[in-house]
Structures are given as structure tokens and as C-alpha cells.
Amino acid sequence: MNRNDITEKIITTKVAKGITWESVAKKVGLSKEWVTAGCLGQMTFDEKQAKVVGKIFGLTAEEQKWLQVVPYKGSLPTPVPTDPLIYRWYEIVSVYGTTIKELIHEEFGDGIMSAIDFSMDIVRQPDPKGDRVNVVLSGKFLPYKTY
């Protein structure tokens, strides 16, 4: 058994029972974005959170322990994503990455945007021409230091 097996069980149970990520997040008491990432194997749950997730998805005590193991983050099955939605993000970074970098450096100086001290919010934005996906990424700016 490994973390991928637990993720597959969570997804299978989610589909079979019609569970939503938002309902899981409410029971865990955290954002739907973070909890979804955790259920998909990209974040580490603490013991209390793992028990809540375990109860929702019918996980054994051993399976709940796997939710508490630090995962190998950013583990997509291929270097260039093939899923169309994920590929759009790859494309966005390919096209706009240098622009984002330049504008962040112009505003903040030389450094990076943290993906650790980070939050994300995904909401539906109604639009008469077709609903839009509104994604807000908020990461702490971390300046490079001289030494």
C-alpha cells in the first residue's frame, strides 16, 4: 500500500457516494482548495484531519496514517501534463511566466512567491457570455538575501 493507493480509494469513494470536495472541506474545517490537494496526495493532513477524511471516505487506521506522511509534491505522471485543464496552466506559465516574473520583480524586487506560505481561492464568476473561472493565488514574497 502507498499514498497513491489511498488517493485512488478516495477518488473512487467520492464518485460512488457523490461526495463534493466542498463538503469534505467543511467537515475538515479548512479551504476546499487545500483539502482537495490533500485528498489528491499533495498535502499532509495532521492526525485529527486524517481521521475526519478517513471517516468520510471509509479509510482504515492504516490508510489514515498514509494521509499523514509527507508526500512527494508536484508529482504529475508526465513532465508535460496531458490533461487538457492542467495543460492550460502549463500553457499559461509558458506564455505569461516571464511577464509574471518581470512584474513581480518590478513591484517587489528580486525574490520569489512562496508556494508554502500560500493560499488559493477558486470561484465561479457568472458572465452572460459564459461563466468564468476566477483563480486567486496568494503567496508571501520571499526576497533573495545576500550573504
UniProtKB/Swiss-Prot annotation:
Q: Does the keyword Lyase apply?
A: yes
The EC number(s) attached to this protein equal: 4.2.1.104
Which cysteines link up through disulfide bonds? none
Q: Which GO terms describe its biological process?
A: cyanate metabolic process
UniProt entry keywords in alphabetical sequence: Lyase
Q: Its biological function?
A: Catalyzes the reaction of cyanate with bicarbonate to produce ammonia and carbon dioxide.
Q: What is this protein called?
A: Cyanate hydratase
What organism is the protein native to?
Polaromonas sp. (strain JS666 / ATCC BAA-500)
Q: Kindly list the organism's lineage.
A: Bacteria, Pseudomonadati, Pseudomonadota, Betaproteobacteria, Burkholderiales
Identify the gene encoding this protein. Answer: cynS
